[in-house]
């Protein structure tokens, strides 16, 4: 009889296999950003072709500008783990990370930038393992069903944004990202989850009823 994976199996798999890898990448990006900031740069990019354990291109940029009220995760942040693009052409899976921060928040809020970077890095790495069979990235048991139609309907506003958070691929990625952030902050995972849901509710993305459902 095939053994059914439990929630603890899922969490422990992420902890044992990918946390050290996520830590290495997070540290490399963060050190590049810090060095660029100290050298007076206002747009600091880190890019790399990852070929160890997983295969994907990593692009991570932070913009330091007064147009941002505080700290923001900018649109365009995300991952595409597919072997083929929308036109059916072969592509290398990729992770793009774009952060923006007001210069008045630095250097005091670098620790918050780091914690958010850890969350996003681990979140997007989880997406890489949900696809990319030809690249050897897909890991058995991960949700791989095509959810592009649901995502499109949500983006068009035809379905509530809360549905996005309940897509199987997003549930797994959110849990691993928030778990990893909590580990870095040395806090309980529930604290990281509640803080994330607080920001979504306060931003009007979800309401109280949807929060309970999530």
Language model features with spans:
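Short acidic, low-complexity intrinsically disordered linear motifs used
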Residues: 1-14
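Active-site scaffold of zinc-dependent metalloenzymes
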Residues: 72-115, 128-132
């Amino acid at each position: 009889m095939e053994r059914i994976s439990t929630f603890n199996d899922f969490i422990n798999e992420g902890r044992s296999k990918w946390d050290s890898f996520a830590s290495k990448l997070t540290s490399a990006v963060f050190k590049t950003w810090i060095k660029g900031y100290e050298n007076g740069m206002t747009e600091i990019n880190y890019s790399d072709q990852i070929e160890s354990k997983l295969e994907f291109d990593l692009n991570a940029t932070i913009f330091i500008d007064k147009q941002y009220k505080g700290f923001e995760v900018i649109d365009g942040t995300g991952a595409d783990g597919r072997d083929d693009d929308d036109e059916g052409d072969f592509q290398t899976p990729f992770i793009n990370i774009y952060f923006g921060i007001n210069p008045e928040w630095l250097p005091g809020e670098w620790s918050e930038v780091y914690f958010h970077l850890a969350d996003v890095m681990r979140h997007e790495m989880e997406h890489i393992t949900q696809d990319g069979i030809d690249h050897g990235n897909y890991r058995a048991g991960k949700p791989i069903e095509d959810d592009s139609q649901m995502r499109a309907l949500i983006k068009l506003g035809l379905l509530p944004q809360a549905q996005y958070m309940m897509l199987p691929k997003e549930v797994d990625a959110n849990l691993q990202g928030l778990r990893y952030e909590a580990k870095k902050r040395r806090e309980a995972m529930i604290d990281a989850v509640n803080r994330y849901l607080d920001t979504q509710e306060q931003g009007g993305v979800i309401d109280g009823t949807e929060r309970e459902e999530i």
